[in-house]
């Protein structure tokens, strides 16, 4: 017996309830069919949360080690046409496709109006080298410069004015995004400076703002633009513990103030763990090129002695064949 002691009223309503159930189920079935039909012809909307979107949170490429070559320079690498360029802390060197040296500048700081002593990662566009230069000592940078060099003579052509109000305290890498008309810079120094990417106008050199990285990598060393994304190398593995360094990826939408960073590749296949530096993409060959140093102990970003078995630092460019996932 029902708790309300009114069984006659409950049974009286059953036929009407049955009709309602049948009608309701018919309507629901019709909606489901319509929804299924619509979804089969329309593209699913992009998920707003990065963690729900595999296209954002997973690597977009596979990178297979193809080889390595020793180079004269421990900082950065770039590629255009038939040539490669490598930066040392105080040198610029040009190579042909077979890694034969073509030209070298051992005094790249001639022509600066303020004191600089360090070159970081580099990039090239229309045979002009874009160089991140500064005065760097024991983990502290100052006198940051965006410098442009001739790709043939390796001589300084011009510099862009740096914007101190940006909050950038160091310049470890630089990348040209020609499609967006932008030059991007990254900072090796952590805390607030290392959490942002800094944008300048490619034509005028004017500062255009900064983008906050969500899940920012630690100790950024290089940055490069490829296939609509920005890729960054980070010296975030402890060489003393044989920990590998990493490649990260992000995509910045027009007008965005922040971007999500994704782990793209772990470099556990280099000759020996040391210090990762700059990177570039050889688009004609479909390869990623990464500069790696080994042998020297690095303290606050500077070589301080050597590991057992080494009496000098060895700089190598590792090449990786790229296969797109989608």
Question: Residue ranges of each PLM-predicted region?
Answer:
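Repeated scaffold domains used in trafficking and secretory/extracellular systems
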Residues: 71-78, 113-123, 165-176, 215-224, ...
């Amino acid at each position: 017996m029902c708790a309300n002691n009114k069984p006659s009223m409950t049974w009286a309503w059953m036929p009407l309830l049955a009709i309602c159930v049948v009608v309701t189920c018919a309507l629901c079935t019709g909606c489901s069919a319509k929804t299924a039909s619509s979804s089969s012809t329309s593209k699913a909307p992009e998920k707003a949360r990065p963690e729900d979107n595999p296209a954002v949170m997973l690597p977009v490429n596979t990178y297979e080690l193809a080889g390595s070559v020793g180079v004269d320079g421990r900082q950065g690498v770039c590629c255009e046409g038939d040539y490669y360029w490598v930066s040392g802390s105080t040198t610029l060197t040009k190579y042909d496709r077979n890694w034969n040296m073509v030209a070298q500048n051992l005094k790249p700081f001639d022509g600066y109006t303020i004191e600089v002593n360090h070159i970081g990662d580099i990039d090239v566009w229309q045979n002009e080298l874009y160089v991140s230069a500064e005065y760097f000592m024991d983990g502290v940078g100052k006198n940051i410069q965006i410098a442009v060099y001739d790709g043939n003579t390796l001589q300084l052509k011009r510099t862009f004015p740096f914007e101190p109000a940006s909050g950038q305290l160091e310049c470890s890498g630089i990348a040209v995004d020609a499609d967006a008309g932008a030059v991007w810079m990254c900072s090796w120094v952590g805390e607030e400076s290392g959490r942002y990417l800094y944008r300048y106008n490619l034509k005028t050199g004017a500062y255009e703002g900064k983008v906050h990285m969500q899940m920012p990598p630690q100790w950024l060393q290089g940055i490069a633009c490829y296939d609509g994304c920005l890729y960054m190398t980070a010296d975030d593995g402890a060489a003393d513990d044989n920990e590998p360094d990493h490649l990260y990826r992000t995509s910045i939408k027009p007008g965005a103030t922040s971007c999500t960073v994704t782990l793209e590749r772990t470099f556990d296949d280099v000759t020996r763990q040391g210090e990762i530096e700059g990177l570039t993409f050889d688009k004609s060959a479909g390869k990623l090129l990464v500069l790696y140093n080994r042998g020297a102990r690095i303290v606050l970003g500077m070589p301080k002695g050597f590991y057992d078995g080494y009496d000098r630092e060895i700089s190598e460019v590792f090449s990786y064949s790229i296969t797109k996932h989608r």
